[in-house]
Amino acid sequence: DLHSFPTRRSSDLLGRNGAGKTTTMKMLLGLTKPTSGEVKIWGKALQGNEKKLLPRIGSLIESPGFYPNLTGTENLRIFATLRGVPNNHAIKDALDLVGLPYKDKKLFSQYSLGMKQRLAIALAVMHDPELLILDEPINGLDPIGIAEVRSFIRELCDARGKTILISSHILSEISLLADDIGIIDHGALLEEESLAELEQKSSKHIRFTLSDTAQAARILERNFHENHFSIQDDHNLRLHNLDLPVGKIVTAFVENGLEVSEVHTCEESLEDYFKRVTGGEGIA
């Protein structure tokens, strides 16, 4: 159940290994058939429209098969011919984006892991797709390689207006790579929200456990002109404005007939939030 991610933004499918991230991406590319339901892209069913839809998508799923005895440019020329990419300018532009030289005698077999990953992303963007699907694009890279990949992913999204769907299990990279987050576990999308919303949910806050959160929300809005709160369920409310007088809020709740059983100041990390949503262990 993959909802509609925003266009011209970078969205991250976040989940532990085996959560269903790669399988979901393969279904979006027609590489795996769903056991039930259907895949729709841009409002159209993928099945029966592959020739129209798939050329508008670039992807990196696992490692592409490059020829080890050819240079990066020579490898891209072969794929360009197969895909009908018209000229060498598209190849040069893709290589420039990922920081690889167009005129280079180094063979693919001599590439470092980071260079191989960059060439794979160059292949994914060479035909100027509208949508990019990148499965674990920073997996196995050193800090410098991660920073480089992060930089041109942001450029594709921010400067070139691409819609990007990334899968990841590295929490520390989320805020640097993604605008929107989807938490996936056992093949189901559990949460889908912007990074700003996610950070607010996992930031420092005051948690009230009480008899009626809907009434508590009305009291906060009416008595304190406050709307920086989130209702978790019928009995738990989070207040994100820490400058408000907690004692006066509790008094107002009680005077209006609410039963307040607990008040806590909480600070939840992104990993804690992930654990709570998935109901399991950490993401690693």
Describe the function of each predicted region.
Residues 54, 76-77, 92-95, 147, ...:
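Generic structural signal for individual residues within well-ordered alpha-helical segments
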Residues 204-277, 284:
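Short, charged/small-residue-rich alpha-helical element at the C-terminal edge
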Residues 151-240:
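ABC transporter nucleotide-binding domain
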